A protein has these predicted regions:
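Glycine-rich phosphate-binding loops of nucleotide-dependent enzymes
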Residues: 2-268
Length: 268
């Protein structure tokens, strides 16, 4: 069966998740979840606390191996791959709790992401051989470009330890982009952002998508989710209870009962 179309365009499946299950002892955190992510879209993953969203992210990116199921990224099986191998394949992610190198600047943290595709070896870097010097220069230029894309270039030389919470989260997004992903997974990117910063994040997500990168977000800010998402997947107690465009999700009785609530639907 051909993939559905959107706006008259043929949609290409980039990520295909089938029957993924993850258990921890007697607890089934993710229960037989299947969905597709289409190239060039922004897809949101929502649900109550404990619904299995971050566990599913971990299963997709090699941090937790699912007990059952398949994760195909552009036809490549990701189950069983290490996180670094997943990054090299073209899948990057951020975490719910930011993980920056505190002794480095914002720009240096972003430069770390470029190492996924650098050609230089350890010896070349230690001896400062021409190839290493050139790649360091390219990495700094790329860090500046990505911080401009995110809208925080002025923080490039600021120590990570001194960054406000919202800026730290945006630096982590820039570092993930530095790995040159085709698929970017963001775990609660709006956490710690004020209303102005959240509005800027919305525009950043659109700019990232417009560069050709597909985005999947886990997020509790329903205003942001409804503004940016092409598709929304809803989990509750580890199971998929709904999937579809924002307007459909807002009206789904199961979603309203499990997560959104009547008042939330009226507010978004």
């Amino acid at each position: 069966m051909a993939p559905p179309t959107q706006g008259g365009r043929h949609r290409v499946t980039l990520l295909q998740v089938r029957n993924v299950t993850k258990r921890f002892g007697g607890l089934t955190a993710v229960d037989n979840v299947s969905f597709d992510v289409f190239e060039g879209t922004i897809q949101a993953l929502i649900g109550p606390n404990g619904a299995g969203k971050s566990t599913l992210f971990n299963a997709l990116t090699g941090f937790d191996r699912p007990d059952e199921g398949s994760v195909l990224f552009d036809g490549i099986e990701l189950v069983g791959r290490r996180p670094r191998d997943t990054v090299v394949a073209g899948v990057a992610r951020t975490f719910q709790n930011t993980q920056l190198f505190e002794a480095m600047t914002a720009g240096e943290n972003v430069m770390v992401g470029t190492q996924a595709h650098q050609r230089q070896g350890f010896t070349a870097a230690m001896l400062r051989l021409p190839i290493a010097v050139a790649e360091d220069r390219e990495a700094r230029d790329e860090a500046g470009r990505l911080l401009r894309l995110i809208g925080i270039e002025e923080w490039i030389d600021a120590p990570a330890a001194d960054l406000p919470a919202g800026i730290r989260r945006l630096v982590e997004i820039a570092r993930a982009l530095a790995t040159e992903p085709r698929l970017l997974l963001l775990d609660e990117p709006a956490a710690g952002l004020n209303a102005t910063e959240t509005g800027e994040l919305v525009q950043t997500l659109f700019r990232v998508r417009d560069t050709g990168i597909t985005v999947v977000i886990v997020e509790h800010d329903m205003g942001l989710v409804m503004d940016v998402s092409d598709e929304i997947l809803v989990l509750d107690r580890g199971r998929k209870i709904a999937e579809g465009p924002p307007r459909m999700i807002q009206k789904d009785p199961a979603v309203i009962a499990a997560y959104l609530g009547e008042e939330a639907v009226e507010d978004v």
